[in-house]
């Protein structure tokens, strides 16, 4: 195989070749989120297929969803702290929305620390607080999306 053809194949598999930039290692957090999302989707499919699967995998799905939410909280916390400075061309509301997401992610992390993974389902008060945090995060993310589309 000649080098040009090999380059084309590698670009198709791994993305465009950028000689000036150093290739970064795949982001472990993003990969973990992707894997947890795929696992949850597979478990949901199995649960839908039969009652026996629902009985067998219901707890596993709850734990998988909890891990995915914890990873998302960590991701929003990291990305929000990375984007704490205003960049040229960023609409003014985006930064405050990012700060809100960071605060919500921190609160969500504290919730996960207080409720261990094995203590599912959560205590009613913790579950209510967690649901409120989820709604607040979703509305902040929706506002951020709306601002970024303007």
Residue ranges of predicted features:
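Non-heme di-metal
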Residues: 1-150
